[in-house]
């Protein structure tokens, strides 16, 4: 298992415009078609994923609106928890295997508890979780606004 935070934060980078409402990142997480290079160094083209993304939890519209309302340059964090092909049986997981789903649900909960350590649940940002299985392994993708509510109800930037 590998946990990776991605460089995408909503800020403009490498000559590319920003994604202040996280819409591009959300579209990547949820889309059946993705913009990727066919080969290393080649221009990006629209490619259909081998399998459609699987929504797990979170409300994309709420996260997008939250990110759009933030006054920060880096408005969201995104990443992936990727498993080796031999760690999780994709067919069983996508079929709803109770034990495997329980395992990944607990892992996502533990990840959130670690990422937001010390922050009460009611002050944490909503997390969008989607699964990708198009690489013949399970990938749990996450995205959340980089802000929490303080005890006075004000938004404060966080850096997970």
What are the residue ranges of the model-derived segments?
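N-terminal nicking endonuclease/strand-transfer module with a His-rich metal-binding environment
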Residues: 1-160
